[in-house]
Amino acid sequence: MNFIVYPALDIRNGAVVRLQQGDYARQTRYDDQVLPRAQAFADSGATWMHLVDLDAAKAGGYTLAPLLRQITRATGLQVQTGGGVRSRDDVARILDAGAARVVIGSLAVRQMTCVIEWLQAFGPERITVALDTRQDAGGVWRLPVHGWTEVAEATLEALAQQYAAAGLRHLLCTDIARDGMLSGPNMDVYAYLRALVPAVQIQVSGGARDVADVVAAKMAGCAGIVLGKALLEGRLALKEAVQHGSVADPGDPLPCGELTEPVCRYRSV
């Protein structure tokens, strides 16, 4: 399994922005140079990027298809992208526009049966399920939805296992407490997921700040890491991150069994 560094761009009203902990009222706007930034990703050695339509995530109706076509044609990058995916037709349109994978977030929690049908229809390499999670006072990883204002009945553990059983291959998980905070990823939750669903490739998202975080994700056996704010603010050089992500490990990641014991306190009861 090749470790993938995903430089990320979140787009709102045509501009590159970042939200702090997913809050639209706590937005930082950077610029509208989306295509030049994507080209810079490719020039730095990235082979993939992560593209989010924040307008669609809020209102529905993916709007970035023209931009997606420009990016893939101009840069050669493979793109996983989402935001506002509500139907099978949405998935098909985004794939037709050039996406390598479509990211499905809120709907993956609310309508799992539909998403599993799409997974089977389009194939496991074309879908990434994105689950945003927050740990409750009892240590259970919950799944906030509707802009993180409500909490789903299902737990992270339950959904991850059900999707794994249905053949899911790519799972992106964001610890809400770390999102946009530059405080480092919560590696406990990723080790937990890797032990729980070892056949699923786990992507780290939220809090990455430096090369050490990239290395930690790789050494934990994760499949990739999404880099957003740290790149936009110049705290992390993408070329260096890609180089560290591609370096062969001195040994295999820890077997899943060795990861289970330290994180068993996070299992739901």
From Swiss-Prot:
What Gene Ontology molecular-function terms does this entry list?
A: 1-(5-phosphoribosyl)-5-[(5-phosphoribosylamino)methylideneamino]imidazole-4-carboxamide isomerase activity
EC main class here is: isomerase
EC number(s) recorded for this UniProt protein: 5.3.1.16
SUPFAM superfamilies (UniProt xref)? Ribulose-phoshate binding barrel
Instruction: Quote the pathway field.
Output: Amino-acid biosynthesis; L-histidine biosynthesis; L-histidine from 5-phospho-alpha-D-ribose 1-diphosphate: step 4/9
Pull one GO CC term from this UniProt entry.
cytoplasm
GO terms, biological process: L-histidine biosynthetic process; L-tryptophan biosynthetic process
NCBIfam families, per this entry? 1-(5-phosphoribosyl)-5-[(5-phosphoribosylamino)methylideneamino]imidazole-4-carboxamide isomerase (TIGR00007)
UniProt-recorded name of the protein: 1-(5-phosphoribosyl)-5-[(5-phosphoribosylamino)methylideneamino] imidazole-4-carboxamide isomerase
Per UniProt, what is the name of the gene that codes for the protein in this document? hisA
